[in-house]
Amino acid sequence: MSVQRVKMAGIVAALLGSTVAANAGGFERSSQDFDILFEKGNAVEAGGTFVAPQRKLKNIRGSRVGAATGGINPITRQPYETSVDEAKSYWVPKASAKFDLTDDLACAAQYRQPWGIHTDVGVDTVRMFTAIDQKISSNDYGVNCSYRFAAGEKSYFRILGGVSYQELKGEQTKMIPPGSAFGGTFRIGSLDVEDEAVGWRLGAAYEIPEYAMRATLVYQSKLKYNLEGTIDNLAIVGGRGIPINVESDVDTPQSVEFKFQTGIAPDWLAFGSVKWTDWSSITQVDFDASDNNVIRKGTTITSLNLYYQDGWTVSGGVGHKFNDQWSVAGTVTWDRGTSTGLTSQTDVWLFGLGTNYKPNEQFEVRLAGAAGWLSSGELDDTVVNGKPNLTGSKGEFGNDFVGGLSLTAKVKF
């Protein structure tokens, strides 16, 4: 079996993983990457993934605010629409610079955007009373390292670890009805919060390079945030909105991921992975007044009701190298939805295909695509955690298409 030929297919397998991670459950968009540390030599890699989810909500109904307005939208002066395209397309960049410090120690500086979500339902349906536009964005600046020990004549054991500095930002707009605690007329309020945090990860790997066999297990810690910012246009004084300073404690979830690959025939590689993410730790995110300027400090102004269930992502595939320049790989991935009925984040099935072109030993470019569906279901946030939610509503959605495209280039030196 040609080890180098098999390894090329393994590179394509890693590429397809970037397309899958960019549409994972919860609001994860990019997972940690230790694969580059297993390659020999110094390298710089950069690329990105474009994802286009086509989630459409239908038969939207059941809003108490909508009923109170007689079914007439106060903005358009027309009956409320009952369907809307919810999801927005997005781009996820990623970059790494890897260096061999010794024969056994390697480190990589990395940039990625681990968390993100963007939905926009506009102001035509009663969903605007839950949220009009919601956006979470992030930046991660990290370092991952690997130290290798001999574990036999042809095998190695590695200790993997890393740290990251992360920035997290959350934005939301929603329609405020006159019956809110702050009174006033129909108006759009906005939430804008952000914070920074530090996280870590630790893992181990076992490999037999001659057979392109590798198994890795990595734990990623949760990150603790104290989000701070303002809610605007909620409190009205003298005919104008007064910003309310707010804060919220929230943790991004911990996770454990297992990856495995092995050569199965000359120029053929099989690979797979399983990842668990502790999304059930995120239930209700309260935004409380952080001072006494407008309302008593500690008073909950608004909440983000998620009540997620844990996420599971299972992926498998096969790669093949045709010659010294071209390799291909295909994958099948299932991502369990994190929704418990309050959101439209249901199961995702993805089928991926990618190719790796390497014209010489110093440069290679990878292109991968994935297509699949977001599974059907229903959402109902008229009752949250056993309590009536006056601004909630009900809706349905079918099996909707999702597609992704990833492009990456690498230079070795």
Task: Describe the predicted segments one by one.
Residues 2-11, 16-122:
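N-terminal, post-signal peptide beta-strand-biased segments of exported outer-membrane/organellar beta-barrel
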Residues 25, 57-59, 64-70, 92, ...:
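Outer-membrane beta-barrel porins/channels
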Residues 1-2, 161:
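Charged interaction patches that mediate protein-protein contacts
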